[in-house]
């Protein structure tokens, strides 16, 4: 085991005599040194000037000190086209191998922009394919560090073939081992499809770019003027497209996020997530374990159902130490997704955010949550759902862009999930959105509600206008105060149906609890569900509405 930036052995000052044992060893050290320093000093200096590290420096940042074991260090390309045979650096522009992160094994590849611009050729691709196969065989996560100009044009279709080999392995590994992509520079053309298939993509502000076709091609074909940053920058993919899951301020931040993310995940779909020492909920009455932070939940939900509150305040009071690692925080902010721990064990959190679009479900929020729920289900991570949803976002834009089909993805994700599912309704749960957000009817195991919950077909205002349309019209004809009557009828509807007790009477809610008792109830539910076993009907695969 070694550092990625330190070659094994000291290179000889002069050409060694390879006819002796000592000379052969010296020759090995020379080759190792050339492999580690494959990029020219000028290329490395340019990389550093952009605020970017080299491929090997990034591996050293990611892995535990001294844990890196390199593969194919001496591999070189075989191309003779366009004078390529005159320049055959060791490693061929990508560093591959394995090591540990916090003592847990991971496989890694890191593209080297200082060698051929990180372009992918046949040997380059074969090295990535080999380490992907190793990750699958050994059941460990794969971290890919991308910094590449794209396919190596000089090698022609061989490069394209290796891209497809990589895509195929990304697909086969999906749901088997966690796959994380770090975009540390350009990632263009067909190369973008590998990160797209992986589970999480992290980009660095101002230095990362992903796009199928670049600004110049777009200008030529469509006449549009767009910058690299606006077209495919880190902020664009975090805020607008949703292709990235974290916007890092720099490379240190990006790698720190990946290391923290790995701490919540199992090594593969047959193992369990790491369990850390956490604040355990004591046996006995749930009320006995209520602390000051828990009591703050009792006053969190405003009296007015139309006044927002921050759902993050709920999440941080339920998870250990208030630590919540959010995923896709800048995309579809009306839906919160991320990881926390309860009693030291990982849990995925899905929550409506009343501070954004009143917590409504739209296309982006539905797809964001659906992907997250499916990831948690694939890797046996329980899902905690916090519900405050007034419905689906209305509008022609949503309807014409496929909210029916795309919103159904979230329903599908919950219905096919077999991991422990615990749902807490904090306030609104209206109409079809109630069904979609981890309802008992879709298979949730434990459904809890706060006394502030309003579980109904629709809100009081809309319901009163429909139920009492004739009565309101007659009052208007008589010259009575229609608004006062409407307010009274709305209150009557709220008192009758907008509460958690109608659902509780039917068993759709297992218990109505004080907000301050939520952590205790959730912890006990997850403890009880730890050995849950559930099987779906036999099938090749379902047909999710893509």
From Swiss-Prot:
It catalyses: propanoyl-CoA + hydrogencarbonate + ATP = (S)-methylmalonyl-CoA + ADP + phosphate + H(+). Disruption phenotype: Mutant lacks PCCase activity. Mutation has no effect on erythromycin production. Residues 1-20 are annotated as: Disordered. Pathway: Metabolic intermediate metabolism; propanoyl-CoA degradation; succinyl-CoA from propanoyl-CoA: step 1/3. Residues 21-540 are annotated as: Carboxyltransferase. Keywords: ATP-binding, Ligase, Nucleotide-binding. GO terms for molecular function: acetyl-CoA carboxylase activity; ATP binding; propionyl-CoA carboxylase activity. Residues 292-540 form the CoA carboxyltransferase C-terminal domain. GO terms for cellular component: acetyl-CoA carboxylase complex. Residues 21-277 form the CoA carboxyltransferase N-terminal domain. Pfam families: Carboxyl_trans (PF01039). The keyword Ligase applies. Its EC number is 6.4.1.3. One of its GO terms (biological process) is fatty acid biosynthetic process. Probably a dodecamer composed of six biotin-containing alpha subunits and six beta subunits. Belongs to the AccD/PCCB family. PANTHER family: PROPIONYL-COA CARBOXYLASE BETA CHAIN, PROPIONYL-COA CARBOXYLASE BETA CHAIN, MITOCHONDRIAL. This is Propionyl-CoA carboxylase beta chain.
